Amino acid sequence: ELPAAVRAWASADVPVDFHATHDAVEREYTYHLHSPGASLSRAEDAVEALSGTHDFHNFTPDETGTVRHLDGNVVGDGEFLVVTLTSDGFPRQFVRRAVTVIDAVASGAAGLDRIESLLGEEPLDGPAGLAPAPPEPLVLTAVEYPPVDFEPDASALASARDVFGSNAIDYRTNARVASTIAEGIDREQ
């Protein structure tokens, strides 16, 4: 049984040897990066520099599977940059580390030369390395499994909408409460 926060709303018949990780031919991740004041233009330049086929060995602790083709996009949404990355596979922590450098470039803390050095052959560890961004804003938004054809379940879809709709209201409410407290603290100063 899945935890209450995990929802499946479609299923498919697959061969016995099907493997959800290894049989996927494309994955898409979306990261909601809170970065007020960031330059969308600089973020777009960073995503463009990361796009294409590269050895991303400095973006993961993995020793193998680091050469990947990446397609990316970023849009501004208020105080957020919404970063979408698509590939045939992602090494561990790759998306979160890519977001770290996109944020650094977008905020002006780093230039595009930072991406060039991270894509270089030299391993960069410690202070020269790249820490992963927090996991909470990361969403796996699509996975492609040809020729698997998923069939949505109407009641599961309705349940998922209800759960995530309720979660959205709860989180917005919590954000308002936290903002009220922060504003109250500021007034006391």
Predicted regions and their residues:
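Structured-RNA-binding interfaces characteristic of tRNA pseudouridine synthases
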Residues: 1-189
